[in-house]
Amino acid sequence: FLRGAFALCAGLALVPPGQAQETQPDAAASAPKPEAKPRDPNKGSETNLPIPRYVTLKGSEGNARRGPGLTHRIDWVFTRPGMPLRVTAEYEHWRRVEDSEGMGGWVHYTLLSGVRSVLVTQDLAEFRDSPDPNAEVLFQAELGVIGRLLACTTDWCRISTDGEKGWVRKTALWGVDPDEVLE
């Protein structure tokens, strides 16, 4: 046995330095590789949904972390159920989100919902009967009220909050883009 092992080692030593032993080419390695399609920077790498986009906090609390993973420290805690959040990045099961004030971090996707909501950003927002500045005012909502987004035209959004529905000027809301139209 020792002679065979010695002969093998001696045979390997005969290969001149800097030269590799011949190998058979791998058919898969020599096959043409398909071109990778460039990733759309306006789509999420995990979901292929638009980036940025708006989502809603599902529960009563959501930890926003410094990075995408449980080992990263918690920088912020969202505490308003239904709060609209803007997704700005994706990494595996994590979404980078921010609120209306730009606060945020990485949140696990299970804490978020695709149901849309908006935040009233004016002291008093008038909810009207139709998307018209002369339409009857049904009620008013104070700064910070969260409502469910039902529809949007170019200038108005139909919102539901506390069982009431009405049309609000888009400029009085956060959670919908200025050019966004929803039917």
Predicted region positions:
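SH3-family beta-barrel domains
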Residues: 22-66, 77-81, 88-91, 98-103, ...
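Short, low-complexity, intrinsically disordered N-terminal peptides in bacterial proteins
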Residues: 1-5, 21-23
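Bacterial N-terminal signal peptides
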Residues: 3-13
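Sec/Tat signal peptide C-region and signal peptidase I cleavage site
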Residues: 16-20
